[in-house]
């Protein structure tokens, strides 16, 4: 059995992710040890900041990563993590983002530093992504609810056609107690479509950890079934 990781910042020296070619090698080695067979490279794209030339450079670096990853028998897929900020419409209109491997899926994120915004700030932006013909995959949903999980809100995302992604590292508490609590709540409620590593480093709390999470959650699910 192997994993496909749809969220990873392995393309070095272009965002806050892997800083160097050497670190990319180390991260890919760890990914292989974690039984990851394919990675969607998702550099951060910030509307109003990144230009058409930047997107071109990102794609070129992803190609470099793809070549490197062949040494580890890992497939690399094109993608990005599109920040739906106040300039998001410009990015949508000018195609300043990278859908996952030219499909209708695009990984999107909001500001993790504060409580998730109101419907006009969030749901309207997700709708606009869909109106352009894309399916939003909402990155690390567990990190947006600073004041506690709003299950109805997440259900609304799903009912509108969005995909819910949770970070593997949140189950380990690497994003704080609140994010860990919400990650397990989402799991218990059956509201997670994808668990991804969101790898940013080759060491520390943001390295590949899907294998560890698989066994952790497998154990928890078995315990839940036993109790039931």
What are the functions of these language-model segments?
Residues 1-73:
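An N-terminally biased module of ancient metal coordination in phosphate/nucleic-acid-related enzymes
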Residues 7, 43, 76, 140, ...:
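Divalent metal-coordination and catalytic microenvironments
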Residues 10-21, 109-116, 171:
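Active-site mouth loops of central-metabolism enzymes
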Residues 46-49, 84-85, 143-147, 171-174, ...:
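Active-site environment of divalent metal-dependent phosphoester hydrolases
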Residues 51-160, 164:
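Extended substrate/RNA-proximal surfaces in nucleic-acid metabolism proteins
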Residues 161-173:
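His/Asp/Glu-enriched short active-site or ligand-binding loop at hydrolase and phosphoryl-transfer sites
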Residues 189-208:
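Short acidic/histidine-rich active-site segments
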Residues 209-228:
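Mid-to-C-terminal alpha-helical segments outside catalytic/metal-binding sites
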């Amino acid at each position: 059995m192997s994993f496909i990781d749809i969220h990873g910042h392995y393309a070095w020296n272009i965002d806050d992710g892997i800083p160097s070619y050497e670190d990319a090698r180390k991260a890919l080695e760890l990914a292989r040890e974690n039984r990851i067979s394919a990675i969607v490279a998702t550099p951060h794209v910030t509307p109003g900041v990144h230009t058409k030339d930047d997107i071109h450079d990102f794609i070129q670096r992803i190609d470099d990563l793809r070549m490197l990853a062949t040494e580890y028998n890992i497939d690399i897929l094109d993608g990005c993590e599109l920040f739906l900020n106040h300039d998001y419409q410009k990015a949508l209109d000018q195609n300043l983002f990278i859908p996952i491997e030219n499909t209708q899926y695009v990984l999107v994120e909001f500001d993790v530093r504060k409580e998730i915004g109101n419907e006009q700030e969030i749901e309207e932006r997700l709708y606009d992504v869909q109106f352009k013909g894309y399916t939003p995959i909402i990155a690390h949903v567990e990190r947006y609810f600073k004041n506690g999980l709003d299950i109805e809100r997440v259900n609304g995302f799903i009912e509108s056609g969005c995909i819910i992604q949770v970070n593997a590292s949140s189950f380990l508490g690497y994003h704080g107690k609140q994010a860990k609590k919400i990650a397990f709540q989402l799991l218990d409620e059956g509201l997670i479509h994808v668990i991804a590593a969101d790898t940013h480093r080759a060491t520390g709390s943001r390295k590949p950890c899907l294998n560890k999470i698989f066994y952790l959650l497998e154990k928890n699910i078995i315990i839940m079934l036993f109790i039931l």
